[in-house]
């Protein structure tokens, strides 16, 4: 690809960043579509995010992806949030229109699209959702919008727990879905929740390098063949949770599905053009 002075820059702001497949995926898509943009990853955390956003404006970047740990903080630095992003309380995409920043969240729509593509109808179903960060809450919000009946969210009693409670309140007030929040340490409640769930979704970084040998499921007997298990982590591709689920006979959806579909929506928001889906799936080796 020959980059000229006419090219615009799109970024990804996250920490850590080296594991991300987004730069490779987006640049392959941009090159295939023949569009004058280049996508670069920048190591940015909560302490440098404000400066990075000022840099985005100063450099007239077209926009940026936002990943851990910046997704919730990023809401404070945009001029406008979509209704879904307000419900989530986190964004993963910023579009810069001449200095006016719009915040979107494509994590939820991407993950739910991957579930739909598998043939699973979530309407009226119950989900156990692990985590309360930006990705997890985005998935929960979109699932509620799409008609899921109940979400049982489990998170450790950390800084995200109160945010999870606030998220549940927003969803309960604005949708027909019922969201409850429980401490992940409450194994009795967790066991009961899984026994009646239709979907188990991991929205945490457990399973991601360097936590690739870990899973939040300590007792694999909790996994049943009729349970759909979905994963946000894509590096490694086959997380310990997915291995446990497949051994238990569960249908699974790996993290590539979310990466692909959320990235496709980001691409279209930044460029206004269709994402070359089939080409990207082929060159990236995605099974989703």
UniProtKB/Swiss-Prot annotation:
Binding positions (substrate): 71, 107
Record-listed E.C. numbers: 1.1.1.282
Alphabetic keyword roster: Amino-acid biosynthesis, Aromatic amino acid biosynthesis, NAD, NADP, Oxidoreductase
Pathway the protein takes part in: Metabolic intermediate biosynthesis; chorismate biosynthesis; chorismate from D-erythrose 4-phosphate and phosphoenolpyruvate: step 4/7
Positions annotated to bind NAD(+): 132-135, 155-158, 205, 232-235, 255
Reactions catalysed, as given in the entry: L-quinate + NAD(+) = 3-dehydroquinate + NADH + H(+); L-quinate + NADP(+) = 3-dehydroquinate + NADPH + H(+); shikimate + NADP(+) = 3-dehydroshikimate + NADPH + H(+); shikimate + NAD(+) = 3-dehydroshikimate + NADH + H(+)
GO biological process, one term: amino acid biosynthetic process
InterPro entries linked to this entry: Aminoacid_DH-like_N_sf, NAD(P)-bd_dom_sf, Quinate/Shikimate_DH, SDH_C, Shikimate_DH-bd_N, Shikimate_DH_fam
Family annotation (CDD domains): NAD_bind_Shikimate_DH
Gene Ontology molecular function: quinate 3-dehydrogenase (NAD+) activity; quinate 3-dehydrogenase (NADP+) activity; shikimate 3-dehydrogenase (NAD+) activity; shikimate 3-dehydrogenase (NADP+) activity
Domain of life assignment: Bacteria
Quaternary structure and partners: Homodimer.
NCBIfam families according to UniProt: PRK12749.1
Main function: The actual biological function of YdiB remains unclear, nor is it known whether 3-dehydroshikimate or quinate represents the natural substrate. Catalyzes the reversible NAD-dependent reduction of both 3-dehydroshikimate (DHSA) and 3-dehydroquinate to yield shikimate (SA) and quinate, respectively. It can use both NAD or NADP for catalysis, however it has higher catalytic efficiency with NAD.
Similarity-based family: Belongs to the shikimate dehydrogenase family.
Protein name: Quinate/shikimate dehydrogenase
Lineage, uppermost ranks: Bacteria, Pseudomonadati, Pseudomonadota, Gammaproteobacteria, Enterobacterales
